[in-house]
Amino acid sequence: MVETGTLNELINAVMKLDKKPQIGFIPLGTMNDFARTIRLSTKKTFLAKNIDEGNIIPSDIGTFNNSYFNYVAAFGAFTPVSYVTSHKLKRKFGKLAYFIVAIKYLNKIRPYKITIEAEGESVTDEFIFGSISNSKSVGGFEWFKRSGVKINDGEFEMLFIKRPHGIIGYTKTIFAILFRKHNNKKYFEYYQTDKIKIKSESGIPWTIDGEFGGRKKEVEISNINMAIEYIIPM
């Protein structure tokens, strides 16, 4: 059984091998995000009995400067929101539950002035959140439509949320997030591509596969297509 950080350590070890073994794992904690994406059962007894047999699914892996990540590299606001939003609140209010909890974090949000270089473009702006992922959900929240995410297409989903201004700006941004209006450049920069470079005036604290990834002023991220294979018990 592995948590996110443990699988990240395993991925970093496996990527150094010339002959890479197929990987089977039993998800714990935040790894349910990636497990849902690859349709891996969360029934621990079933997985333990069948961990070495099943369908084989190739998966992309990301490089983060000189290390690797499995499904997400992220920074900024809202990263704790999905974890602290109770199931009771979500059952009662649906997506609005995230909005209710997110409001509590507004006074803790810090913008970062960064330059994004991707797809031959360079964009400099203030952003409160950034995520480079290979998963339908990050932090328990589905940021992207299910049909738009494939774990072995050679591309990552890259979402950056621009700094809102005032309570009205934050409200509109949160609703744009909830209803996945990612192509609206008033609120977001959104890419589906295989590489990106991010530069900041000050070091940004990154989260890599759910674990602290250090403070970085410059980050280069790229996609290694179908780098490893997962075993999915059926």
Predicted regions located by residue number:
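Glycine-rich beta-strand-to-loop/alpha-helix junction loops that act as flexible
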Residues: 1-4, 28
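Short glycine/serine/threonine-rich phosphate/pyrophosphate-binding segments
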Residues: 6-10
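Catalytic core of DAGKc-family lipid kinases
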Residues: 12-132
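ATP/nucleoside-binding phosphotransfer catalytic cores, i.e., glycine-rich phosphate-binding loops
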Residues: 118-119, 124, 150, 160-234
